[in-house]
Amino acid sequence: MTHSLKPWNTFGIDHCAKHIVCAENEQQLLSAWQQATREGLPVMILGEGSNVLFLENYAGTVILNRLKGIEVNETADAWHLHVGAGENWHQLVRYALDNNMPGLENLALIPGCVGSSPIQNIGAYGVELQCVCDYVDCVELETGKRLRLSAAECRFGYRDSIFKNEYQDRVAIVAVGLRLSKQWQPVLTYGDLTCLDPKTVTAQQVFDAVCHMRTTKLPDPKVNGNAGSFFKNPVVAADIAMELLERFPNAPHYPQADGSVKLAAGWLIDQCQLKGVTIGGAAVHRQQALVLINANDATSKDVVALAHHVRQKVGEKFNVWLEPEVRFIGQFGEVNAVESIA
């Protein structure tokens, strides 16, 4: 007996898992993990499946993390939120704004659960989770022991954290602690936000502008399956960026604190005239080249072939090799996404 994963991944790819368990508390989560381990099955914990591509049927147990709850403590200088890992991220952003606690508005409409946010160190429009994260609570899957990691201990990087490295498959995130400063400073460095006046802008206006940009550029997964930005924005050495800018002076580029330069993957793909290109049922989105969509009952093979095609074209033109932001899941667990499309 197998269970379809189609409802549990926003790409809408139709693969199956041996078992799917919905965990609404820590005990259910640990019990499901221990049961699978006893049976010698692979096991993975999934939020809303908005950043994964299942390559084939999964041979084990998928645990859906649905631990809910939001607690707020107010101090003189900040609001401290303790949020269950199974809460929806965008609903949390709205909750904070509705309760006059600004600071998350640039991260509006990022799909997925709160518990997934530190894994990827989610970010958009100049703000990353690490800017507001206070701590992450997790449990060791083998022992059931509770751990609280400070933001520094999470070792956040660009779409990276300790949870994608040493702690992968070792812990389950059960809650995230956020600190929202009462000295709110709008971040208006990207897109339409640069048109807003930092002296008069409200958090609600930033939220509305971010939602407008995302809804006009990004496809709704309910209409066309997708996992948001498929590729990371490449971060390259300064000399490589200089060389590229000599050839393409209008290329968007963002100098980083360490001297490296972040490039816009969507722009690179667009310059290769790849918008609308299809392989099988998979397509490059016509409005936002960074997004690959399930346009017509795509298989995972279609998506992988399209991602390979995009990576090759960009690499040949710019000598910059894109890496997927989406996580690739094989029969027994996560596999190397770069190798899968190389």
Swiss-Prot record:
Q: Which organism is it from?
A: Salmonella paratyphi A (strain ATCC 9150 / SARB42)
Cell compartment(s), UniProt: Cytoplasm
One GO cellular component term: cytosol
Reported function:
Cell wall formation.
Reactions mediated catalytically: UDP-N-acetyl-alpha-D-muramate + NADP(+) = UDP-N-acetyl-3-O-(1-carboxyvinyl)-alpha-D-glucosamine + NADPH + H(+)
EC numbers listed for it are 1.3.1.98
Query: PROSITE patterns from the entry?
Result: FAD_PCMH (PS51387)
Annotated Gene3D superfamilies: 3.30.465.10, UDP-N-acetylenolpyruvoylglucosamine reductase, C-terminal domain, Uridine Diphospho-n-acetylenolpyruvylglucosamine Reductase, domain 2
Which UniProt keywords are listed? Cell cycle, Cell division, Cell shape, Cell wall biogenesis/degradation, Cytoplasm, FAD, Flavoprotein, NADP, Oxidoreductase, Peptidoglycan synthesis
Q: Which gene encodes it?
A: murB
Q: Where is the active site?
A: 159, 229 (proton donor), 325
Major location (coarse): cytoplasm
Q: What is this protein called?
A: UDP-N-acetylenolpyruvoylglucosamine reductase
Q: Which domain of life is it from?
A: Bacteria
Keyword flag Cell division: yes
